[in-house]
């Protein structure tokens, strides 16, 4: 039985699609390494299943990117509850920052030790994600210091979590 030309075309189209998809994924990962909003779009759905982008997320993300680059020195974010402040500022941004600067120290302070530890756990878990490794290859956690409130990278960086109240 001779191969059908339509089957051959279909197989080639599938292979072309797979190659294009792989190339696009690599480009997005490269962009996520340098652009925080791209990182947010890629990683936020891992934290919130029904994640939706809003203009306020784009504005905050741009300001956080400027903070990381040193363009601005301080940033205060004021938004109503349930506006994704914690997801962006206390989970995704520290993960992106440590991916770009794995030798730095980060301190997260919240109103309670428990909330700070919860943030630390989320950031640590993001750093352990396979997608994070694709973006920031080579950044990994030390196996001997991995508590939610204090963990270290193999590059010498440290994440600390502290609360104003116990």
For the regions a language model picked out, list residue spans one by one:
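Short alpha-helical patches at coil-to-helix transitions and adjacent helical residues
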Residues: 57, 86-91, 113-116
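Conserved nucleotide-state-sensing and coupling region of NTP-binding domains
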Residues: 109-160, 165
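Contiguous, well-ordered alpha-helical segments that form the cores/surfaces of helical PPI scaffolds
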Residues: 61-65, 87-99
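Post-Walker A helix-loop "phosphate-sensing" segment adjacent to the P-loop in P-loop NTPases
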Residues: 96-105, 128-132
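N-terminal accessory segments
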Residues: 1-72
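Residue-level preference for the first positions of well-ordered beta-strands
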Residues: 74-76, 105-107, 158
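Walker A/P-loop
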Residues: 71-94
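Alpha-helix boundary/capping segments in eukaryotic regulatory proteins
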Residues: 83-89, 99-105, 110
